[in-house]
Amino acid sequence: MTRPSSASLREISDLIALDTTSRDTNLPLIDLLEAKLQAVGIDSKRIYNEDRSKANLLATIPADDGSRRGGVVLSGHTDVVPVDGQNWSSDPFTVHERDEKLYGRGTCDMKSYIGVILGKLPEFISAKLSQPIHLAFSYDEEIGCVGAVSLVDEIVSQELAPRGCFVGEPSSMRAIRGHKSMNVFKVSFHGVAAHSSLPSEGLNAISYGLRFASFVEEIAHELRTEGPSDPAFIEPTTTMNVNLINGGIAVNTIPSDCTVHFEFRSLAVVDREALTTRIKNFASQLGEEMRARNPQASMTFEQVAGAPGLDTDPSEEIVDLAARCGAIAADDKVTYGTEAGLFAAAGSPTVVCGPGDIAQAHAPDEFIELEQIVACEGFMDQLIKELSS
């Protein structure tokens, strides 16, 4: 079989060697990306998080005439999920090649994609581009598409107005046009502790947490049975789940605190803001009832993470461009979420297309097949031709 270029393999190895687990800083990797870009004459801009421990990186390879507006975004996230508790056959932060596969944390999701881009920088620079190529690398995708929000805002602020975007999440180089939104919430009920033999002197926070969780399950059932639905998804309806509940300190103590974590993933036709408001209103009613019983009680409703879904029309130019670059056409929609919806919501029609199989992402002994890297290289080569004058 054809092997990936030595440039791609070298860049992928360098990226994997940097542990960018979401809980930690990604700045060493941003330093590396920045240096690689500077080495070929490309300026970039960092967009930091609030405490400057992490950063996005945005760079533009201008068209041959110097234009920076329009063109295409190549987007990828720099963080990876933890390896804690996983049984790996080799060091997860050192690339190992076995059986025509590369093993290591992030090989599939999604440092191989970024590595291919870095390996192709000389070709990007030497091409006589008729349209610019924008490189957008984010932080904290794995914990809720956090960094991409300010990254997309920066693209809008610079008035780059890209005509389309490719998000290189592992799709086996299939052109994915749709996925659901992602919405994660934490609802905290604060009651009053008391001895369990004197319940009237306390206010049971778990009781209110359970009532709230039951309401969420009722809505989940409603969405599952009444729709709307989209048969392109394995799970054709909007899904909603209570996934974590914490509360109480002892069996003989009325619990003063209970926290309910829930999430929903909605179809594009569902108004996610209206759905959130409906649930929040019920939580607020419970909070008012608690305060009426005891003024010390309270309720807080917090959205922890969220990103819009993706539903790119097949007639969009970016879909045709993906096909011309060798992406495999796909009519199904994927269950996982990506940053693609943020780019699309900002006016850039977006396709998810990258090397690797999502089934290998996040797993112990994460890997990517070498032929997937080769396919991604071919995609980039054809993209250069398509965008050249």
Q: For the regions a protein language model found, what residue spans apply to each?
A:
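Short, conserved micro-motifs enriched in small and acidic residues
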Residues: 102-114, 142, 203-206, 367-374
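Acidic, glycine-rich active-site loops and adjacent beta-strand->loop/helix elements
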Residues: 52, 78-79, 101, 136-145, ...
